Amino acid sequence: MRIIANKNKKNKKKFPWKIILDNKRCIPVPSQYNFKSNFIRRHGCSLVGFYMALRFRGIKKNMQQCLSYARRRLKCGAKYPLTEICRGINMICSGKPAVYHKSMSNDRIEAHLKKGHMILFEEGNPIHTVVLLRDNKTGRVWRFSDGRKNVTTVEKENKKKCTNEKYKGIVIVK
């Protein structure tokens, strides 16, 4: 896995980073605050996770297509909960690649990351969805959120987990 800065002047603002996986698949990292749609700017973190998970599985939809699909087929409160995002990924992708868990131990999350899976994680206070991926060459765990990338640990992220009954959870995308 490599993470490179986007050099394209047309879409650099909306997608500042690109993740290139070992199988040469490219996942742009969206910055939700630079989209026209008011819903994406305010509550788009779960849609960013939805978009990145579909790209991880090899399905190319843009953010607007993800939003229109979610509006037509998924249930929404203030934002889309991870249960609905998981259901949406499984509707689009063949083989049911996404699995939802209410909570998970650090060891189990670490094991999934070592296998090369993508993790969508709901943080609390404020409620926010982030994407976790592991670089197998360096062993670092990367956290993607709001068009930014940070190195983190599973323990740090698990301490920040959401406790709200409706929104809490973890989605593993294989």
Where are these regions (language model features)?
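Conserved active-site-adjacent core of cysteine acyl-enzyme catalytic domains
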Residues: 54-174
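Active-site-adjacent structural segments surrounding the nucleophilic cysteine of cysteine proteases
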Residues: 1-75
